[in-house]
Amino acid sequence: MSAPATTQVEILQEGDGKTFPKPGDLVTIHYTGTLENGKKFDSSRDRGKPFQCTIGVGQVIVGWDTGIPKLSVGSRAKLSIPGHEAYGDRGFPGLIPPNATLLFDVELLNVN
């Protein structure tokens, strides 16, 4: 039996290479989330307002808590997050099916 898949991070644009978020840091990001079939379910870009969250404290899905700290300020990356590190068996009714792999285009704007 193989180990379950974990969040994959593909850097699309390098950041400053030195300012990486640590657990407890407040991050400001822009993101677009899609399902594997390309259906968009959420986007801070569409709202025209970056999203802020505290990283590494369980405030967001596991895939963000593990993937975003691999980015430095100014980075843009694709996060591929397996269902068990996203919304799991419950999904997000009406938007995300149970155990769905989620794809996020994430840009790390700031770390406080």
UniProtKB/Swiss-Prot annotation:
GO cellular component: cytoplasm
Membrane recorded as keyword: no
Activity regulation (record text): Inhibited by both FK506 and rapamycin.
Bias (Polar residues): 1-10
A Pfam family this chain is assigned to: FKBP_C
Principal EC category: isomerase
Record's keyword annotation contains Isomerase: yes
Domain PPIase FKBP-type intervals: 24-112
Recorded catalytic activity of this chain's protein: [protein]-peptidylproline (omega=180) = [protein]-peptidylproline (omega=0)
Domain of life: Eukaryota
Region (Disordered): 1-20
Main location: cytoplasm
GO terms for MF: peptidyl-prolyl cis-trans isomerase activity
Compartments it resides in: Cytoplasm
Gene3D superfamilies the record matches: 3.10.50.40
EC number(s) given by UniProt: 5.2.1.8
Family the UniProt entry places it in: Belongs to the FKBP-type PPIase family. FKBP1 subfamily.
Function field: PPIases accelerate the folding of proteins. It catalyzes the cis-trans isomerization of proline imidic peptide bonds in oligopeptides.
Name of the protein: FK506-binding protein 1
Species in which this protein is naturally found: Debaryomyces hansenii (strain ATCC 36239 / CBS 767 / BCRC 21394 / JCM 1990 / NBRC 0083 / IGC 2968)
Highest classification ranks of the organism: Eukaryota, Fungi, Dikarya, Ascomycota, Saccharomycotina
Gene of this entry: FPR1
